[in-house]
Amino acid sequence: MIDLTPEMIEFTQRLEPIARPGGHGRVLMFMGAGRGTGASTLAREFARIAAARSKRGVWLFDLDHAKNPQRKILAPEGGQSFDASFGRTPFWDVEPATARARMVARKGGNKLYVTEFQRAPGEVKRLNLRPAPDYWRAVRSSIDLAVVDAPGMSRAVLALVADMDGVILIADERRPGTDAIEARRAAIEARGGIVAGVILNRGPDPARWAA
């Protein structure tokens, strides 16, 4: 396992403060600019390091609703679950509307929680993402930081970018694909999102950041 702690500590310091003045949290999305960029690993390590510095906790939202890989890594034993609705209409819905589904959070470490999407077998035919500004406002009021791990090759996640405080793109430094980065930046900005930065990730070597 690669220890990304020193690099992610530096990155969290660059994004200080983790929580905004007045007690309002932040919502940051990590998105790969292509396949195999390590975006999910960086999102998880960022959330873990940020949790150690937080007061009200950090939630890692895993948008891979089919496999829930982050929960399997951070909370492999399952354990107690918490409602992740924050008392608001969520950022997702299912078809048919009568299908039984919910999002919960499980404790993944000290002040760190990771989401898990649960569904009744065979009932959900389609899952959609949608803007939900009220939901994310409630998140900001309740916790210090939400880290949203978005599948980089999915266009569905663009429905959420306008509700984020920033989107951090992850690219492979060895083959960064400048055109792909710019295309993803344009798509995010066209939907009202803000690209807060680009991480050029190089596997076991230290990641490098660019504004």
Regions of interest found by a model, annotated:
Residues 1-27, 48, 79-83, 182-211:
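C-terminal lobe/tail of nucleotide-utilizing enzymes
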Residues 4, 8, 40, 125-129, ...:
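A conditional alpha-helix N-cap/helix-loop micro-motif detector
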Residues 13, 20-27, 31-35, 56-144:
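P-loop/Walker-type NTP enzyme "switch/lid" segment
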Residues 32-40, 173:
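Short, glycine-rich nucleotide/cofactor-binding loops
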Residues 40, 70-71, 208:
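Short acidic, gly/pro-rich beta-turn/loop elements at beta-sheet edges
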Residues 40-61:
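A conserved segment at the C-terminal end of the G1
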Residues 45, 128-211:
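Conserved catalytic-core segment of NTP-binding enzymes
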Residues 53-55, 109, 190-193:
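Short, well-ordered coil/turn elements that cap or connect secondary structure elements
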